[in-house]
């Protein structure tokens, strides 16, 4: 780690340029056009608004299945534009689509208004079709298994873009027969009333594939492929209104959240420097790099940021801090053991790497599974979490190491500059396992009893929000335009008091005096009370009427199923990874048992305090799972390390207690740093942000409790207490020593 003066100066300049460059990029972006800047980040409907389009169903008395299928296919169509869009039923025959960050309603109308029907016609069918007569298509969109856009780089055509089609088995047979019967003739491919391709058949095509060629742009080909894959919309939709709407959570949500984040970040840095000194300074610099990199990537990859997405970033910051805490705790332990600072730094990074990689990879696996199988807010959360994970590993194991070496070689070599290790007596955590497990069981039982009582009283077991159960929408056209602040601070409290409810979402139509308020389902008396109370204080425009209607949940049954499936699969994937890394099913089972406890205890909190359960509920639960699994892996990693040095006289109970105690500082400090950010959001945030941050605060505390008091106890009870665990560890070490002494064995 010896550097000459030239290298010191060079590294200093590189790090300084990196910090300044990333900071300027995060603020101003690149190319002088704001590309990659934080200001260029797409914000969701909850934070920035977007376009709202309402369609009327043309068919009379459509079935609920057709409506649900239509909503699902609209969701899939707009998913490529934004994972944070909402589609829901309004009244009996209307469907509303809301897409964040869009200012051109006509563009969306064109995209979504496409029915999506695909037909293959021979010349006879084409002639009848073009004259408006009855015809029988050779194939339809239902015969297509999948469709993908492509670019033919070998083509000399000015339009080398197309869509490759793969037929179903039945569709392939139909296409083979159709081409065999039309050699020398054309087959017309008709999509939504327009001929998109009419190739001449040279021979029978039996491979089950076909292509639509000569598309004008790749985007056009990609959109067509998407619509073909999804299939046609079963109902005919007529657009009745389209508006640009403001943020659902209001302007203050962003402003106050940014202030809270800035204060929280500053306090976090002060805490790290106070506790870890020189490494704390390194952590502060790495967190600045981490934050700017994450914001840059979110902006560059055009991700839409909503409250669930912010949850993913908060978890990412927590994991970035956690990685630093793990390393610096290890460094202090090595210094306390008598090693030089230089060797302690090297050993600290070496010993911390496996725990950091395991914790982040486990969470990254979960994020990938959630992204693949999740929809809507789950996918948005998974995206920001994955980005944060990758950046966290990079900054912790690469950036901080470079900065740490640099500071050491600049003369910061005194052991006191790297913090002081507090020698704790070993706490006998396992001796109180019956009490800690009993506390968890009692809390979980309280939750189930509360939900049962609520159901018996005619209420829902949990206080499901509009996203899950729908409700009512009430629209007022006022005699003047009110600001977002006036709507939030003056009008919404009147609605809450008149209806006796807590959850009210608002949408302000831009350049209009019309404001819509979404609430839980209101009775006739509640609607009349709201109308009377609001119009008494805030007069409406002459000749206008107060519009009221029912709305369905924006989280469809399919999205709910996908969310549950994705969480289950993510948990299984984490279990498999933990088993593969630790080679012990007891570790995996203990981790999953602790995660289940975390989720159920937080659900108890939701049930007892009637906190609204909406889109952020899913993100909250996933954040807690990610945080808890990280803490669990740290302790398990320490148990595994101690088992490697165990001997025949080692007491397994003392070993486990020692592992828990030695990682206690890390668990406490990581919990404090994560809570700093969340508590500031709760103190300064608007109501919706408070409802989002409070369960996270509870979940982080519950995660700390389970990591310290439950996971190792579960492992111990599942068989870790058996003498065979020590014997197996001793035999493995002896075998490894034998191999090292005698050379390779055949």
Protein language model regions, located:
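A structural signal for conserved, well-ordered secondary-structure elements
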Residues: 1-746
């Amino acid at each position: 780690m010896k550097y000459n003066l030239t290298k010191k100066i060079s590294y200093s300049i590189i790090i300084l340029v990196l910090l300044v460059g990333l900071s300027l990029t995060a603020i101003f972006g690149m190319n002088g056009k704001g590309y990659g800047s934080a200001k260029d980040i797409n914000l969701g409907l909850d934070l920035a608004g977007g376009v709202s389009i309402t369609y009327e169903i043309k068919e009379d008395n459509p079935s609920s299945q057709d409506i649900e299928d239509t909503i699902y296919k609209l969701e899939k169509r707009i998913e490529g534009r934004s994972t944070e869009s909402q589609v829901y039923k309004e009244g009996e025959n209307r469907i509303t689509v809301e897409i964040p960050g869009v200012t051109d309603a006509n563009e969306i109308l064109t995209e979504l208004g496409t029915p999506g029907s695909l037909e293959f016609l021979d010349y006879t069918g084409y002639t009848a079709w073009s004259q408006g007569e009855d015809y029988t298509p050779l194939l339809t969109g239902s015969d297509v298994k999948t469709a993908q856009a492509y670019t033919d780089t070998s083509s000399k055509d000015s339009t080398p873009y197309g869509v490759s089609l793969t037929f179903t088995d039945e569709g392939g047979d139909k296409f083979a027969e159709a081409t065999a019967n039309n050699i020398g003739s054309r087959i017309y491919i008709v999509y939504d009333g327009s001929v998109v391709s009419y190739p001449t058949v040279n021979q029978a095509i039996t491979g089950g594939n076909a292509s639509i060629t000569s598309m004008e742009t790749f985007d056009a080909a990609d959109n067509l492929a998407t619509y073909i894959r999804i299939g046609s919309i079963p109902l005919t939709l007529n657009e009745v209104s389209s508006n640009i709407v403001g943020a659902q959570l209001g302007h203050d949500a962003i402003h106050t959240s940014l202030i809270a984040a800035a204060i929280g970040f500053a306090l976090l840095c002060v805490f790290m420097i106070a506790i870890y000194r020189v490494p704390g300074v390194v952590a502060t610099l790495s967190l600045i790099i981490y934050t700017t990199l994450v914001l840059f990537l979110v902006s560059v990859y055009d991700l839409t940021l909503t409250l669930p997405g912010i949850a993913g970033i908060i978890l990412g910051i927590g994991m970035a801090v956690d990685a630093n805490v793990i390393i610096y705790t290890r460094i202090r332990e090595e210094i306390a053991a008598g090693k030089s600072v230089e060797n302690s730094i090297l050993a600290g990074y070496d010993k911390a790497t496996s725990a950091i990689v395991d914790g982040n990879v486990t969470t990254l696996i979960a994020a990938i599974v959630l992204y693949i199988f999740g929809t809507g807010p789950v996918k948005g959360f998974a995206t920001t979490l994955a980005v944060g994970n990758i950046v966290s590993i990079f900054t912790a194991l690469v950036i901080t190491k470079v900065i740490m070496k640099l500071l050491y070689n600049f003369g910061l070599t005194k052991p006191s500059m790297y913090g002081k290790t507090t020698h704790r007596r070993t706490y006998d955590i396992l001796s109180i396992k019956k009490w800690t497990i009993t506390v968890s069981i009692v809390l979980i039982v309280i939750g189930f009893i509360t939900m049962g009582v609520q159901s018996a009283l005619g209420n829902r077991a949990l206080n499901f929000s509009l996203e899950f159960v729908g409700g009512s929408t009430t629209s007022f056209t006022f005699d003047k335009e009110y600001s977002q602040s006036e709507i939030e601070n003056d009008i919404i409290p009147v609605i809450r008091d008149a209806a006796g409810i807590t959850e009210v979402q608002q949408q302000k139509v831009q350049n209009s005096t019309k404001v819509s308020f979404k609430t839980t389902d209101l009775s006739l008396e509640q609607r009349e009370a709201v109308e009377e109370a609001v119009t008494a204080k805030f007069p409406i425009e002459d000749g206008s009427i107060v519009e009221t209607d029912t709305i369905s949940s924006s989280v469809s049954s399919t999205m709910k199923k996908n969310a549950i499936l994705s969480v289950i699969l993510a948990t299984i994937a984490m279990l498999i990874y933990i088993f593969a890394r630790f080679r012990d099913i007891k570790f995996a089972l203990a981790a999953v048992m602790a995660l289940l406890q975390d989720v159920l205890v937080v659900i108890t909190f939701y049930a007892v305090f009637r906190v609204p359960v909406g889109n952020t509920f899913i993100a909250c639960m996933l954040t807690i799972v990610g945080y808890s699994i990280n803490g669990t892996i740290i302790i398990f990693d320490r148990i595994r390390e101690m088992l490697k040095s165990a001997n025949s006289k080692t007491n397994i109970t003392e070993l486990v207690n020692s592992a828990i105690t030695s990682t206690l500082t890390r668990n406490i400090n990581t919990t404090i740093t994560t809570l700093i950010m969340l508590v500031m959001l709760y103190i300064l945030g608007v109501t919706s942000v408070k409802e989002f941050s409070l369960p996270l605060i509870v979940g982080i505390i519950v995660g700390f409790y389970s990591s310290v008091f439950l996971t190792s106890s579960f492992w111990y009870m599942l068989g870790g207490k058996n003498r065979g665990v020590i014997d197996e560890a001793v035999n493995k070490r002896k075998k490894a020593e034998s191999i090292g002494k005698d050379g390779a064995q055949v």
